[in-house]
Amino acid sequence: MSELADRISWRQLREFADVDLTRSFVLSWHVDADTLVIDVDLCLESQHPFYEKPPPAEKECIRPAYIEFPYCEHLRQDGGERGEAAEIARNIGYGAITNLCLRDDGQYAISGEFGTVIIKAEGPILRLKGS
């Protein structure tokens, strides 16, 4: 099987039902205890239970949210060395998300304007702020 065939796309993960990560934006990264927390502006699709029609000046329903990876053992960015998760998280940039997948080696990969970040952790949890 090819490398792509061995991956599970974010679209197949129930945590991301009715959202569009490719129209979402990473604002910051940090580690809280052993959980990687990615602060995002999340694009909700019209089927999402918290979707609200955007005002005329906006095209999308964007809500502040967190993507959390509990029990984060390590992070690696763009082929760099593994290291202390909190230190690596502090140095990751921000920007639009292009992809998130579960790789065939059991690690997650999130890509975007900030590069590609490899995450060894439990499965992601999506939390809307204020809900």
Regions found by a protein language model. Name each.
Residues M1-S131:
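Surface-exposed, interaction-prone regions used to assemble/regulate multi-protein complexes
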